Amino acid sequence: MATAFLPSILADASFLSSIFVPVIGWVVPIATFSFLFLYIEGEDVA
């Protein structure tokens, strides 16, 4: 029963790549560089 349900989920989830590509390409680097910048510029770094 699960094997018949899985292809319909994968067919309906084809829009996910258009969501994850900008997230991985823009949001993750912005968050990473922002955190690293704030960490490096902080006063209490040993």
UniProtKB/Swiss-Prot annotation:
It is a single-pass membrane protein. One of its GO terms (cellular component) is photosystem I. The chain crosses the membrane at residues 20-40. The keyword ATP-binding does not apply. It is found in: Cellular thylakoid membrane. GO terms for biological process: photosynthesis. The keyword Thylakoid applies. Keywords: Membrane, Photosynthesis, Photosystem I, Thylakoid, Transmembrane, Transmembrane helix. Residues 1-11 form a propeptide. InterPro entries: PSI_PsaI (IPR001302), PSI_PsaI_sf (IPR036357). It holds the Pfam family PSI_8. It comes from the Bacteria. May help in the organization of the PsaL subunit. Belongs to the PsaI family. This is Photosystem I reaction center subunit VIII. The lineage of its organism: Bacteria, Bacillati, Cyanobacteriota, Cyanophyceae, Nostocales.
